[in-house]
């Protein structure tokens, strides 16, 4: 990988790397090569040094103070290794990971960061946060986005334009940019200072594809951060394990983030780093592994997550689709001012329900907005949907009236959304908890009457066949166990459920 990158730079026609009729010994003696190489590395966006670590508070808003796992970040070893952060949704894992990565950059253990996420929507949302981080940590940095539709991402194209634009003095006008050379190929995504990508871009480094060694070289020199590490299937976890083994072999570092990680998956990830944990693990926790037994840091009592109850009900319906009564309840909730999310497992079901809701609202001669968000849109339309979803249901949304969104799994993870009531089709317990992380996510003084506490309605099938749902999730046993727990409780109590429920469902 290193040799390929050197060859690409050395053979580029944009620079004249030698003076005609100059002896090779004189060429090196005059330091011409060193100067030219430095210019090329800067021009191509490969060279930038992070500023000294200034503390996690620099990454937080001025009114915020470190909380939860964040207070333990500065106690993590600044040595190459695997760090695993387990903490509830919305508890600041991302800032904790970025702060720890900054500490490793400051110690010279790495010179860049790669942030991998499960979906294009979450990668797009992370790009803006990466820009803010880059300004604080690098000052002048190249931020690269990599997924199959990045050419349609307006924010990334703006970074590319900033990289191409020059002032009259030949300096970049923007401190955050993406050099054209880096943007020309997704193979170079990990060669800038910060790479934001979907996780498949990382996994390609261990698959038999062209120039995989270039991706590997970029990863090995970076701090690799993988978000929502619980969200991948067995095949992807196998590939991720190989990525971690190679990262360890070259003395690299990795940070894994999850709110809902089964013990078996945690053990496999630690084993990939030739390390091990304990079965009866605390929660939340930060693990650091080099080799042998991983060290585990718990969160001080005063910073532990507050007890949080989500009121639940489980309804058995034909094909788990809302009937007339449930549709009426959804509309009534929105009329009372609630922001309601309905999460379907199939795009066709989401479209069908949205049509049904709009038809019923029209018949009642009332005005309620019904939004739809899924992965089947043209990408340019999907971007608009992402922005609208965050605008209407995010932290800074104006909540002057009720609203309904019918969505699929695209709102399940990493998006900063806040709902008063959620209805969701049956899904594995860890993914259910991710969905519940969008309920009452932010502190608000006033919630609509009847929704002062977070509420979730799980829609399940009438029989135990689960139909297409078992094909989506591939494990009927997990769905059945999840439903069994829901049927026996009228509420889920966090953070204890992150361990208790998940281990009961995923018991060996």
Indicate residue ranges for each PLM-predicted region.
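Conserved pre-motif I regulatory segment
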Residues: 51-86
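Conserved interdomain linker/interface between the two RecA-like ATPase lobes of SF2 helicase motors
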Residues: 276-350
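Walker A/P-loop
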Residues: 79-101, 232-233, 258
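N-terminal accessory nucleic-acid engagement/regulatory domains that precede
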Residues: 1-58
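Post-DEXD/H (motif II) to motif III coupling segment of the RecA-like Helicase ATP-binding lobe
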Residues: 217-223, 230-299
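A substrate-engagement module of RecA-like helicase motors
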Residues: 130-193, 199-203
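Conserved Walker A/P-loop ATP-binding site and its immediately adjacent core
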Residues: 111-134, 145-151, 261-265, 347
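C-terminal helicase lobe and adjacent C-terminal extensions/tails of nucleic-acid helicase motors
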Residues: 266, 318-398, 419, 423-508
